Amino acid sequence: MTAAKPKPTPTAAKSAASFLYHALHWTLRLSALAFIVREAYRIRLYAITDYGRVIHEFDPWFNFRATQYLAANGYEAFFKWFDYKSWYPLGRPVGTTIYPGMQITSVLIWKALNAIGAGKLPFALPYLTGAGAATTVAWVTEYDVAMSLNDVCVFVPAWFGALATIFLGLLTYECARGLKITSAAWAGVAAAGIMSIVPAHIMRSVGGGFDNESVAVTAMCATFYFWVRSLRADDPHAHRWGVVTGLAYINMVAAWGGYIFVLNMIGVHTACLVAMGRYSRKLCYSYCLFYFIGTAGAMQVPVVGWTPLKSLEQLGPCLCFLIMIALEVCESRRRAGGYKFLSVANVKVYLAVGIACAAALAAVVAALLPTGYFGPLSSRIRGLFVKHTRTGNPLVDSVAEHQPATQAAYYQYLHYSTYPAFAGGALCLLGFSDAKSFLVAYIAVAYYFSAKMMRLILLMGPITSALAGLALGFAADWCVDQALLPIGGVFKWAFPVMLGDAKAEEEVEKEEEGEKAAAADADADADAADKKKPAAAAAAAAAAAGPSLGARLTRWALLIYNSVPVCLLRMAAAAKLCQWAYPHGRTFYDYSHQLAVGMSHPSIMFKGKLQNGETIIVDDYREAYWWLRDNTPEDARVMAWWDYGYQLAGIANRTTIADGNTWNHEHIATLGRALTSPEKEAHRMVRHLADYVLLWTGGGGDDLAKSPHMARIGNSVYEDICPGDPTCQRFGFMQGGVPTKMMSDSLLYRLHSGGQQKGVFVDPNRFKNVYNSKYNKVRIWKVLAVSEKSKAWAADPANRKCDAPGSWYCVGRYPPALRKLFKKKGIKKKSFAQLEDFNKKKSKKDEAYQKAYMDKMAGKGGAGGAGGAKQAQAAIREAQEKAKAAAAKLPKEQQAHRRRRRDAALAAAKAMKWADSEASSQMHKLVAAGDTTSLEAWITAQPDVVHLRSADGRGPLWWANELGQAKVAKLLKSYGCQKTLKDKGGKKPSALLKKNKKAKKAAAKKANKEEAKEVL
């Protein structure tokens, strides 16, 4: 009989199994993570690949300009920067109104890269020759990491998008620890994979989109990770991570105003844990360290200052901080006295401390409340709690991102990731812990607020990825284990657990029990210490009695689960699961890339095709700004709607009237008054404020589309613009696209369409057309008869109002001539801020205005009387007659402008490929549902979607006509959807409208016949 080969000892077998098993798993995990991080970076580079290293949109141009100023002038000058090239003539104290985190980070990266610069890196690789002699191969690699500041700012969103992916993976890993049914590491990898490409994150982190959120999401994920790390159950010193949490939170505060969400999220989580009876010294120390360090650091950011201790939306976490201290005082007394929790002595301690704290808090509030110390909820924050879709502030309501989110929006930005997220949420309820409860609280709060404001869908990206990662991590862990079974069959000694080795199972069980006991001991308090001896005695008695019935059943179940037939079934099931999951994962991957391409189209330039098929880049906006930079004096003042202020200052380097900071509602209202007033009256104002007027005139989201907001914002301060009508319904267009009298007389309409539309002319003594862009997207007019006296007065530093002698904080003032003009005309201005501040008493007139505005925006109230329809029809006829009379007066060169404008619109329409896609399917659903709110929000975010075409060549306008959605069709046309294009069969959208009308007539005729038969 052949002697049996010596088998490895159980200890050696276990060591080998553990090493090989974990080595294979970690090799797969690290390989997957490397691919994920690379993908997170690559998917954000479409804009850079297609359009070059260009800063996008509006806000990023201010951020870049501020970064340039910081790099050139240093920190001290930056925080004392009063910018007189914006918000003319008032100026803006940039140093105290900016979140500087992104600028500081970008400058540090830029300096570091340029400090490293270019160089050579030597490498040497020793090896043995065939003769056994040692030799070395050496080579030199050249590198150059130096970059311009522009390039650093362009790449920052992509870099931090990849970094946010890593932190989200760590957060998920930490929350998944202790969940026996899945591997925490695989859960982290799966969550990172989703986070890397989920559109909800990409929409704020594409290359060139140098906006605060691109850095802030990384800071938010880091803060949340360090917070849950500070609550780790099996680490007695985990609370020290509260210090790191506070430091990460300071970075978050410096980066974005959304830090309020992070602060309240951690506060809510802490309060929930206390309410569930999970208070512990670790929780108290972690939260207090975070709040104290984080708040102290946040108050050093000038734009924040004392608001954490004054603003209502931040006082909740402050109250939680005080309660945690009071609870710890009570618990310390209880531990010192050895009281039981429900004992009379302990109740007395809690009552005494509670009453003392409540009395002290009430005294402080009573003393500060009459002084106006506590600030009100801002209009944006209030909009998250009101029941309607309006905040009462027409400036806030004018921004599409501030409107409520729809289910279509969730699907658009989260797609398939929502389905495994539901399963992940259920997994959080298994093995409930402090860390996993954070995910439950996060999803509840984030969903509520994102439903109120579409912009906050950004917050859903990380939590959806984390929850989906829990579910997919479980599936990935199980599938990898099944894939390793054949290897375990070859090296049976290496995988004893997987193949049912009883001794190895016992060792594993003992280890798990030991880890569980260690974790329980680490978190035990005084009560547990009292029960330690009886528990140990009970455990010894149970061990002497032998394994329980449950333990025996578990062992038999493991033996069956690890039997060869079941192992084969498990392998087959894993293969089938992968086969089923791959197409869905691929669809999500392709959809995310498709949407990333759409999100990477900068609004400042776009691709298109002319009628002859030539592909072009429409760069009208930058060319207009360059024209201003190269052809106007350096001190030229340019009036434009506030949307374009950042780009004007950043690219043209010219003085602007207002920009996206929107810090002064009354000043924007003055700008709105100037643009919506009749030409003659407007010129009397404009000549004191500007040398040039710039308008976007390219259809879709141009200035005419924004005109209702201009009038409403202006009317909120100057009630004589639209007396008795807070929504300014008289300033707009009637049936057939005919402007109302107020619109046709306005400076905005005259400068927008003057000389290009029939019957629209501009007074040559007041304004001169000096520039029209190639595709008529931008028009620039020079203001004639400018008041040089007012310009000189505003430029004189002596006329600025400083907060102290010699201070840098000196606010400009309106020229006396403009103030006299307002006084002479009897123009009265009110402070809109009082309508938002509940600390100030509102007059009955203010309350009536607010109520009327809300009612009008909600669709309540009439259009202005019974004769409104007749007056509108009369106005239409009058306008049509005027247009016919003036048709012959249109010069030939102006006809050329109209042709170029039409070509630009057609170019945009033909830029989209004909293909059946997720986007076209989603568009068809919205059109079919008549969901104009979601459509307008989508179009505002991505203007080119109006030109989507399916494989048959049809787009949203065809579908709207076919389905009888007249309101949708009107909306699409207002955003530049072309009605002259043809589908694959050569049909125009109007053909389907006629067909739909015929079908309705036929159906009505048939119904009448059937009704007549029934009567007979």
Regions found by a protein language model. Name each.
Residues A34-L163, V198, D211-S214:
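Membrane-interface coil-to-helix junctions
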